[in-house]
């Protein structure tokens, strides 16, 4: 039942968008095959006339041939795609090359032949590539949707307590925005946000999901008995049609550094289905950027690259690759977390307005920088994190990936400079970050920094598609040099204080036992009695 319902939803949503003439049939068609190409001789391929059944498919139009007098059995099935060769022959005939068969279709009327020709032309010439296909390499899209089609990956996101709970709180805390409303869930995945919308009272939710996860979302919808509320539609929002406009759009489109994966463009594209004054959850995103100092991280990457500086590795001189190795390591953004005290200045904030910004605005993002340095030290690069706000009628809710907030599966991102720069407190660091979108669903990130009033500058270009996942789960360590008192004396003072409390308790005849509270001890018999 799940797969049948999904297929029905997919066809309804995509047929009108891609090929409005693709769901039709033609009766009384005589089908001939070319028997001799040199003599151009034809022979009837089927006994009697046939009916052609056309239906939309993601690859084009499926052409099914059945006999006029027995439509219960499909004689042959073909796919009409953009690569199909076809040509008109006279007023009622049409030649078409399908797979290994070269066929001539003689229709019952000129009108039927013209309509069938339009079906083929719609697939071959009149179907433009979707916005998504134009901006995305096929191999990248395939890997992307395969990745998000795994239950384990959905689980990883769903188990991000901060992420999932914040979304639920934002939606349920603004139930007035969802009560009896039509909702669109873009990139629905497992459908968890759609379920939250239903919990908030939504009348109808269209859950759009392009990966194979759509089938699992449909199973969850049916097993939770909300199929009358949630309609799962397999496909891309750029390639489907909805039966109506929506009041609210919900999505989780953020990637590393907010913009990675270019899902935000899809989120903005979905606004074509939003009613005037409609809501978007989230409503806007803030990308924060700050200069940082971390000698340990810089040395770690530098020493990795120095592997290629060996002149006698098993008798082989590797040094010719040292420069390229260094370039490769420093082109990788670092995904991990850190103590915010490594930041040398207040972060610069760049805002993306999901309600008003255009898709084109995200193709090239040029962010001017000006930092007033708060501490003297070596600047090793720029740190990035983001916050998003859900602006509801009842309340505003923030989801933060700041190093001061609880950790999420987005972590934070740092981009290193191959040539760090020494800067003093009170100086001004200026420059820019340039994010240029690429067809691999990511960005090339160029950093240019300059110390105002000097000739000192540094730059780097990084590949956001290829980050280094450095997070180990270990507690974040405070930056070196941040202790203002002796850590040793602080520790022993704490121990002495604890010892004094225990001694006092013993004198009073009570001690704390394994955190279970006070107990009294009979010293004579060595017995303990709980109070």
From Swiss-Prot:
Q: Name one GO biological process term.
A: positive regulation of transcription by RNA polymerase II
The UniProt record lists the SAM-dependent MTase PRMT-type domain at 141-450
According to the UniProt entry, what is the EC number of this protein?
A: 2.1.1.319
In the UniProt record, which is one GO cellular component term? cytosol
Q: What is this protein called?
A: Histone-arginine methyltransferase CARMER
Instruction: Name the gene for this chain.
Output: Art4
Q: How is it modified after translation?
A: The dimethylated protein is the major form.
The cellular location(s) given in this protein's UniProt record come to: Cytoplasm; Nucleus
Q: Name one Pfam family in it.
A: PrmA
What is said about its interaction partners and assembly? Answer: Homodimer.
InterPro entries in UniProt: Arg_MeTrfase, PH-like_dom_sf, PRMT_dom, SAM-dependent_MTases_sf
Provide the binding site for S-adenosyl-L-methionine.
154, 163, 187, 209, 238, 266
Report the SUPFAM superfamilies cross-referenced here. Answer: S-adenosyl-L-methionine-dependent methyltransferases
Q: Which family does it belong to?
A: Belongs to the class I-like SAM-binding methyltransferase superfamily. Protein arginine N-methyltransferase family.
Q: What is the lineage of its organism?
A: Eukaryota, Metazoa, Ecdysozoa, Arthropoda, Hexapoda
Arranged from A to Z, the UniProt key words for this protein are: Chromatin regulator, Cytoplasm, Methylation, Methyltransferase, Nucleus, S-adenosyl-L-methionine, Transcription, Transcription regulation, Transferase
Keyword Methyltransferase listed? The answer is: yes
One Gene Ontology term of the molecular function aspect: histone H3R17 methyltransferase activity
Q: Which reaction does it catalyse?
A: L-arginyl-[protein] + 2 S-adenosyl-L-methionine = N(omega),N(omega)-dimethyl-L-arginyl-[protein] + 2 S-adenosyl-L-homocysteine + 2 H(+)
- Alphabetized CDD domains for the sequence: AdoMet_MTases
């Amino acid at each position: 039942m799940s797969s049948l319902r999904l297929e029905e939803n997919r066809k309804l949503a995509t047929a009108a968008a891609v090929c409005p003439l693709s769901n039709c049939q033609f009766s009384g068609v005589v089908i001939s095959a070319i028997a001799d190409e040199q003599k151009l001789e034809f022979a009837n391929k089927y006994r009697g006339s046939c009916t052609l059944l056309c239906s939309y498919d993601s690859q084009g139009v499926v052409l099914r041939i059945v006999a006029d007098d027995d439509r219960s059995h499909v004689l042959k099935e073909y796919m009409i795609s953009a690569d199909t060769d076809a040509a008109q022959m006279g007023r009622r005939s049409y030649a078409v090359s399908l797979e290994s068969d070269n066929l001539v279709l003689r229709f019952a009327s000129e009108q039927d032949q013209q309509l069938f020709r339009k079906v083929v032309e719609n697939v071959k010439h009149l179907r433009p590539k979707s916005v998504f296909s134009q901006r995305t390499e096929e191999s990248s899209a395939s890997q992307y949707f395969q990745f998000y089609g795994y239950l384990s990956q959905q689980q990883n996101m769903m188990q991000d307590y901060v992420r999932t709970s914040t979304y639920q709180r934002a939606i349920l805390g603004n139930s007035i925005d969802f009560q009896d409303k039509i909702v669109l869930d873009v990139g629905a995945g497992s459908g968890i946000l759609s379920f939250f919308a239903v919990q908030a009272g939504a009348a109808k939710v269209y859950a759009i999901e392009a990966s194979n996860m759509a089938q699992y979302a449909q199973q969850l919808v049916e097993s939770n008995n909300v199929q009358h509320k949630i309609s799962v539609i397999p496909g891309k929002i750029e390639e489907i049609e909805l039966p109506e406009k929506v009041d609210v759009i919900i999505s989780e489109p953020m990637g590393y550094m907010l913009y990675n994966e270019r899902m935000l463009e899809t989120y903005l594209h979905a606004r074509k289905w939003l009613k005037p004054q409609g809501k978007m959850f989230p409503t806007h995103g803030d990308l924060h950027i700050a200069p940082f100092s971390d000698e340990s991280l810089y040395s770690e990457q530098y020493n990795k690259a120095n592997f290629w500086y060996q002149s006698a590795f098993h008798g082989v001189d590797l040094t010719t690759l040292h420069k390229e190795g260094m370039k490769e390591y420093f082109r990788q953004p670092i995904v991990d977390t850190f103590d915010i005290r490594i930041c040398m200045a207040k972060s610069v904030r760049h805002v993306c307005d999901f309600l008003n910004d255009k898709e084109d605005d995200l193709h090239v993002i040029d962010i001017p920088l000006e930092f007033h340095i708060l501490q003297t030290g070596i600047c090793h690069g720029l740190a990035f994190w983001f916050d998003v706000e859900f602006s509801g009628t009842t309340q505003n809710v923030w989801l933060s990936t700041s190093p001061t907030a609880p950790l999420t599966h987005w972590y934070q991102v740092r981009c290193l400079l191959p040539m760090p720069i020494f800067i003093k407190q009170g100086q001004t660091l200026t420059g820019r970050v340039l994010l240029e979108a690429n067809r691999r669903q990511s960005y090339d990130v160029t950093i240019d920094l300059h110390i105002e009033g000097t000739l000192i500058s540094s730059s780097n270009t990084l590949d956001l598609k290829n980050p280094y996942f450095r997070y180990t789960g270990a507690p974040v360590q405070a930056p070196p040099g941040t202790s203002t008192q002796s850590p040793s004396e602080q520790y022993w003072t704490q121990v002495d204080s604890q010892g004094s409390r225990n001694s006092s308790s013993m004198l009073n005849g009570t001690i704390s036992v394994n955190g279970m509270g006070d107990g009294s001890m009979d010293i004579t018999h060595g017995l303990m009695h709980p109070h």
